[in-house]
From Swiss-Prot:
Location of the protein in the cell: Cytoplasm
Enzyme Commission number(s) from the entry: 1.1.1.79, 1.1.1.81
This protein's name: Glyoxylate/hydroxypyruvate reductase A
Chemical reaction(s) catalysed: glycolate + NADP(+) = glyoxylate + NADPH + H(+); (R)-glycerate + NAD(+) = 3-hydroxypyruvate + NADH + H(+); (R)-glycerate + NADP(+) = 3-hydroxypyruvate + NADPH + H(+)
UniProt function note: Catalyzes the NADPH-dependent reduction of glyoxylate and hydroxypyruvate into glycolate and glycerate, respectively.
Taxonomy of the source species: Bacteria, Pseudomonadati, Pseudomonadota, Gammaproteobacteria, Enterobacterales
Length: 312
């Protein structure tokens, strides 16, 4: 069994050694331009077209939760990957726990009005503020996949009203489910906090725009943990300036790194993190990949395969 590996920033040698240990029967090598030798599996992140084109692969593993970089490249270069080759993504591998930590900490930050107290502190102003009531602090999750489910579970501990919206209806205990475009407005109407965990597909690009933000209650909050392309930044800035959106916590952006001149940096109601909400944990990813390859070799049914038509 031959495995090729490519990631522009990961510690390639660590991964190769870990994979060799986890899959002793495999010959694992770092792919470099010009390497056209045979391979059974490819582990990739933002792969060059030539890495995958023309190969008779058993499967490709994207080294992250999203596969939009591969799918967008396939649109321009359909020859890059045979349609019959299964494409897998890392469904969790520790990312769910990280998303839970990030989402819960920020929701509680807003619920306890720490954002308002920070602004008061900046002007040396001492003034207790009325508390928010839990039963009125509805949390809405856009996107009901593996990570959305994990975030919902973690928020249930705090007894906030929870709702989710997705392409198809879900049956999550304690979570009100909305499905399809026809139910999006009803979903948004009560969301004091909107958490975006949508996949990046042609249908979701620019979905968080003026029209969507206007359907939120006045003074709502936005937490974007998915992709920057989901948000129309000018529309979000306008909503923040008007007070329609009271605050935004943003981990992802249309351009990364976020350019220094981007007005989001200086907005008093915006908090920025550099795409760190949930990073790939190498040891857990290697365990998932090695287990999945073993299942594929046995012809067993596996989880995590991407539906290329849907984009996730």
């Amino acid at each position: 069994m031959d495995i090729i590996f490519y990631h522009p920033t990961f510690d390639t040698q660590w991964w190769i050694e870990a994979l060799r240990k986890a899959i002793p029967q495999a010959r694992v090598r770092a792919w470099k331009s010009g390497d056209n030798d045979s391979a059974d599996y490819a582990l990739v992140w933002h792969p060059p077209v030539e890495m995958l084109a023309g190969r008779d692969l058993k499967a490709v593993f994207a080294l992250g939760a999203g596969v939009d970089s591969i799918l967008s490249k396939l649109q321009a270069h359909p020859e890059m990957l045979n349609p019959s080759v299964p494409l897998f993504r890392l469904e969790d591998t520790g990312m769910g726990e990280q998303m839970q930590e990030y989402a819960v900490s920020q929701v509680l930050h807003w619920f306890r009005r720490f954002d308002d107290y920070r602004i008061q502190q900046n002007s040396s102003h001492w003034q207790p503020l009325p508390e928010y009531h839990r039963e009125d602090f509805t949390i809405g999750i856009l996107g009901a996949g593996v990570l959305g489910s994990k975030v919902a579970q973690s928020l249930q501990t705090w007894r906030f009203p929870l709702r989710c919206w997705s392409r198809t209806r879900k049956s999550w205990p304690g979570v009100q489910s909305f499905a399809g475009r026809e139910e999006l407005s009803a979903f948004l109407s009560q969301c004091r906090v909107l958490i975006n965990l949508l996949p990046n597909t042609p249908e979701t690009v620019g979905i968080i725009n003026q029209q969507l933000l206007e359907k939120l209650p006045d003074g709502a909050y936005l937490l974007n943990l998915a992709r920057g392309v989901h948000v129309v930044e000018d529309d979000l800035l306008a909503a923040l300036d008007s007070g329609k959106v009271k605050g935004a916590m943003l981990d992802v952006f249309n351009r990364e790194p976020l350019p220094p001149e981007n007005p989001l940096w200086q907005h008093p109601r915006v908090t920025i993190t550099p795409h760190v909400a949930a990073i790939t944990r190498p040891a857990e990813a290697v365990e998932y990949i090695s287990r999945t390859i073993a299942q594929l070799e046995k012809g067993e049914r596996v989880c995590g395969q991407v539906d290329r038509a849907r984009g996730y």
